[in-house]
């Protein structure tokens, strides 16, 4: 009996040891996987030193050809060992792929290497007014309403969902939410065909408007056709292409990035700043001058920011408060493999003056699931802390500079620690 119990004990013990070993390996594998980037960008004819200190090695291949290792190419090495510093140099644009192994044995992740020409952008850090028209009418809510007899109606509850976009009414494009409201009020209760877009699927639904208590025909939906606010312009290129915010325009009702048709940038004036405090984020408040000529056209709204064409004839608006006018000559960008923890600066506009303030980059997440939170930052500049309490709403898009290069842009503030926040890599913004 004792022998049998001892055998069971040994089996259980061995199983537990094996489980601990497996879990430990999975933890180590995942940890190393997250520390090695999935992509690396090199600028042509510039040495790049990579220091990851990981027990990972690999072979560099020409992209699309993984059968034969690269022997003679623009890149100076064909074997890499990420347990020590790796120096790469490329003489002309080309794409490569690194097939890696963990501990030199276990197949690991693939790393894409892109060799690109030098990129320069003009860091801005100036607040602008934003006005964007949705691509269709965004449905934010459906519900019931009563007619004059107290009978409840919900014409759209079963067929339309919050987050849907209404593109057409009876085959005709809708110009605005007022267009929809007036057309429904004049429909005399006849059934209506709505063209709906839902998660890239477009289809038609039939709905029958009903009268409300006032005798007006309604559908029982609440829609939006635009978004507006104040944000920070991150950069402008030499050709006038711009990026701003560092994150997309999000509708708070549906917590999703808006699909936009078009929009504009306008001049804005910050009238006041409410300092951030623990538990309460600060914010910039101001006015947008919609009546004046637009500064630029908004063309795209992505997860990483808003993008479009800036009117280069109106660069004086961006220059008026800029302390360092030499920034207009352009600045190189820092790719994520160049960025490191430590001192950096944020370029933002406070009291109509655009200047640098000190921050630190505390953590870098090379493979962040949320690209808007690829860096964790802390405001260390005493003057900025005295003026704003740290990061405030409206600063999203303020460019971050490290080692004389544009590294990223501010995106979020930590509500319980307003001196801390998150940022996006500038290379993520420049992909669009």
Predicted regions mapped to residue ranges:
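PDZ-domain C-terminal substructure recognizer with occasional recognition of PDZ-binding tails
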Residues: 100-118, 181-221
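Interdomain regulatory linker/hinge segments that flank or connect interaction modules
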Residues: 2, 14-18, 23, 27-29, ...
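Serine endopeptidase catalytic core focused on the charge-relay Asp
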Residues: 15, 210-389, 393, 402-403, ...
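PDZ domains, with a preference for the canonical peptide-binding region formed by the helix
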Residues: 82-93, 168-201, 417-419, 423-428
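Gram-positive cell-envelope targeting signals
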Residues: 1-56, 233, 418-432
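Conserved PDZ fold ligand-binding element
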Residues: 69-77, 156-177, 400-403, 407-408, ...
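Short extracytoplasmic
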Residues: 46-75
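PDZ/PDZ-like domain micro-motif
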Residues: 144-165, 396
